């Protein structure tokens, strides 16, 4: 049985925490930042965890994580 390939796109976007959850970056922080206030931009800069609904899909894309 051959090894399962890791989806490289997922590996670049997600990282595994010590507890086994997946960490991700928040969206909306690339451009059009002038209309977003400082508080919102700071919140968007923090990392978030992957929702339980999507965790199964991410785990399937990264079999060795």
From Swiss-Prot:
One Pfam assignment: Ribosomal_L35p
GO MF term (any one): structural constituent of ribosome
Keyword Ribonucleoprotein: yes
Gene3D superfamilies recorded: 4.10.410.60
NCBIfam families named among the record's database cross-references: rpmI_bact
Similarity section: Belongs to the bacterial ribosomal protein bL35 family.
UniProt-recorded name of the protein: Large ribosomal subunit protein bL35
Organism listed in the record: Nitratidesulfovibrio vulgaris (strain DSM 19637 / Miyazaki F) (Desulfovibrio vulgaris)
Lineage of the species this protein comes from: Bacteria, Pseudomonadati, Thermodesulfobacteriota, Desulfovibrionia, Desulfovibrionales
């Amino acid at each position: 049985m051959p090894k399962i390939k890791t989806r490289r796109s997922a590996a670049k976007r997600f990282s595994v925490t010590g507890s086994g959850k997946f960490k991700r970056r928040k969206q909306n922080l690339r451009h059009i930042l002038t209309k977003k206030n400082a508080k919102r931009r700071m919140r968007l800069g923090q990392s978030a965890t992957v929702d339980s609904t999507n965790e199964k899909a991410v785990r399937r894309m990264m079999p060795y994580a």
